[in-house]
A protein has these predicted regions:
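NAD(P)+-binding Rossmann beta1-loop-alpha1 motif at the extreme N-terminus of oxidoreductases
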Residues: 1-43
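Short, electropositive, low-hydrophobicity segments enriched in small/polar residues
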Residues: 11-21, 46, 54, 107, ...
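Conserved N-terminal Rossmann-fold NAD(P) cofactor-binding segment
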Residues: 25-68
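Rossmann-like NAD(P)(H) cofactor-binding subdomain of soluble oxidoreductases
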Residues: 52-132
Length: 132
């Protein structure tokens, strides 16, 4: 199963990183400055459950190709419109879209964009920050 995480910040970086660490086929869709930083320093997770430094698969909006089985949205709600445009090339006819975002209003927007049967309900509870 191919999984695309939009965002590698506190939330997406943690859940996507842990999924990759467990052997899942995870790719992060990030902006170029974040991609450069991850390439240089790795994706670092510091947690009471164990620290990790990963070199995950990365794409930018310019290099994104092909569809994924699942696209996980881990952006802020105010970035939803640009997030939808960024992931559109990765959403094929059988792709599921899983938002793990703040708020619930995004479900109506995602249902209109990608069909309700493909938009999954997502909930996560985590205290995470993006650090140096």
């Amino acid at each position: 199963m191919r999984i695309l995480f939009l965002g590698a910040g506190g939330t997406g970086g943690y859940f996507g990183g842990r999924a990759a660490q467990a052997g899942a086929d995870v790719t992060f869709l990030v902006r170029e400055p974040r991609a450069a930083r991850i390439r240089e320093q790795g994706l670092r997770i510091k947690s009471p459950l164990g620290d990790a430094t990963l070199q995950p698969q990365l794409v930018t909006q310019q290099t994104l190709q092909g569809s994924y089985d699942v696209v996980v949205l881990s952006c802020k709600a105010y970035d939803l419109a640009s997030a939808i445009e960024a992931i559109r090339p990765a959403v094929g006819p059988d792709t599921a879209v899983l938002p793990i975002m703040n708020g619930v209003l995004q479900y109506d927007v995602l249902d209109r964009e990608f069909e309700p049967h493909r938009v999954l309900g997502g909930l996560c509870q985590i205290n995470a920050t993006l650090g140096p």
